[in-house]
Amino acid sequence: HAVRRARLAGGERVVVMGAGPIGLLVLQVLKAKGAGWVAVVEPRAERRRHAEALGADLVLDPGAGDPSQAIAEATDGDRAGVVFECVGSPAAFAGAFRAAGKMGRIVLVGLTPESVPLNALLLLAHEKELVGSSAYTDEFPEAISLLARGLVRTAPLITARVPLERSREDGIEALLRKDDGHIKILVMPGTGGRS
């Protein structure tokens, strides 16, 4: 749904902020829909490796410097035509705003309860667009088709399988720790964790 809302043009340069489950799925759909170049910005090393393995053309660590500068260099100063903010944090929103070029579209996918600062002068002067994305049921048939044709793969996103009785300790708490590289943990009822 988010990719459709972005009105992606074939060959367009795109940035995905965040390589969690949503960001990695957006990356794959972008590649399937003909994005010309996709950069992913992600602070966690294991998630950056997943983004690279799933086809990102450039993977950046925001802790190593301002990603918008590397994006500007990689695009001869143009920056991105579309940026997907898949994190849901004020810092990621600010980074998305900087990564978008003139007349760029910033698609808000990540959720945050916090207010985010917005430089209205730059929004107007650079004619950037903010696009929200949350409803998606109309795209289920297309999503299923992308999965069936192997253009979007979910198996690489599953980084662990846990039995239902251990889902809190080995599932939820592992995801909350954010230190072990998990993307998605699959809970396996009645299997003792065996797949």
Model feature map: region roles:
Residues 94-98, 137, 141-195:
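C-terminal hydrophobic helical "lid"/dimerization subdomain
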Residues 129, 135-136:
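Glycine-rich phosphate/pyrophosphate-binding beta-alpha loops
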